[in-house]
Amino acid sequence: MSMSGSKKDVESEKQKALDAAISQIERAFGRGAIMKLKQHPAEKMDSVSTGSIALDAALGIGGLPKGRIVEIFGPESSGKTTLALHVIAEAQKQGGNCAFIDAEHALDTVYARKLGVNVGDLIVSQPDTGEQALHIVEYLVCSGAIDVIVVDSVAALTPRAEIEGDMGDQHMGLQARLLSHALRKLTSVVSKANCILVFINQIRIKIGVIYGNPEVTTGGSALKFYTSIRLDIRKVSAIKDKDNVIGNQTRVKVVKNKVAPPFKQAEFDIVYNEGISKLGEIVDMGVKFGFVEKSGAHYSYGAVKLGQGRENAKGYLKSNPDVANELEQKIRACLAESMHNSDLFAVDERTDVLEEEVF
């Protein structure tokens, strides 16, 4: 027998053994428990828009990926809940069902409605304990009927033992263990249900840190590992109308991304009582891609004079929605072509990503 014939026989025996193992696994655990990827070709990942054109592009797939866990963290009043509510509003526009787990007991339905959320169809829960909140999340995900679940916030997921104990009792690591146990169960069911699970998280200052970033997020390290997307949202500056502050310029860094290249960033305006300013993004992105010409303080779109100053340009687009829609379509078309360009929206790959602290 030749060497080539012997090698073919060995390969044939290995293939038979592999087929037998696969058949045994399917009998034990059901069809679909194991498969070859060529039987299920890769498809474009479904996503839900964040409500920000720039952030959708920075995420690389046009929004938050379905079937994944997402963390949004940042300082107080930086726009975390606003961003999460915009995601809910966009999911509802697609006909999806959404839930808001209000662990902080601070949901403002009037504000949510102004952001475009259909509060009448929004499922809201205000749990008493962290265990109750995570059980509710599990039941909702397992139903397979929910598209987006927002948990606001991780820091407010108080373990039952801490609530029932005295004020001065120490419960080191209790919340971290609770989250670690819950996320082990939730990861697979979130994927199967094709649901987006968004955790809003707060930051704390770690005492005794001399070098490096002293900021840490609450809830331990488990959330850091189980998330596919981590968004760091910060206020950059105030937006003023004369002497009145009417909003904040906001920057979001994609500090972790499992579905596209990470370390990109996006900037947009959050206007009080309005949310993310899409018109402001259209002006800025229009200038970036060359559709809008900026000469000094004057903005123009072809032969159309948008106005002097950014706020006047936004005002013109607000009064002329056809022009705004035309510009937005051109910008989104350019973004679709350049979405995988690592230079677009890129930031330095710094190592100042937050650590996790056990509370």
From Swiss-Prot:
Task: Spell out the family assignment given in the record's similarity comment.
Answer: Belongs to the RecA family.
Q: Which GO terms describe its molecular function?
A: ATP binding; ATP hydrolysis activity; ATP-dependent DNA damage sensor activity; damaged DNA binding; single-stranded DNA binding
Domain of life according to the entry: Bacteria
Function in brief: Can catalyze the hydrolysis of ATP in the presence of single-stranded DNA, the ATP-dependent uptake of single-stranded DNA by duplex DNA, and the ATP-dependent hybridization of homologous single-stranded DNAs. It interacts with LexA causing its activation and leading to its autocatalytic cleavage.
User: Could you confirm whether the keyword 4Fe-4S appears in this record?
Assistant: no
Q: Where is the signal peptide?
A: none
Which keywords annotate this record?
ATP-binding, Cytoplasm, DNA damage, DNA recombination, DNA repair, DNA-binding, Nucleotide-binding, SOS response
NCBIfam families in UniProt: tigrfam_recA
Short name of one Pfam family for this protein? Answer: RecA_C
Gene Ontology CC terms, in alphabetical order: cytosol
Provide the residue positions that the database annotates as binding ATP.
G74, P75, E76, S77, S78, G79, K80, T81
Cell compartment(s), UniProt: Cytoplasm
Entry-linked InterPro entries = AAA+_ATPase (IPR003593), DNA_recomb/repair_RecA (IPR013765), DNA_recomb/repair_RecA_CS (IPR020584), P-loop_NTPase (IPR027417), RecA-like_C (IPR049261), RecA-like_N (IPR049428), RecA_ATP-bd (IPR020588), RecA_C_sf (IPR023400)
Gene3D superfamilies, A to Z: P-loop containing nucleotide triphosphate hydrolases
- This protein is called Protein RecA
Q: Which GO terms describe its biological process?
A: DNA recombination; DNA repair; SOS response
Q: Does the keyword Cytoplasm apply?
A: yes
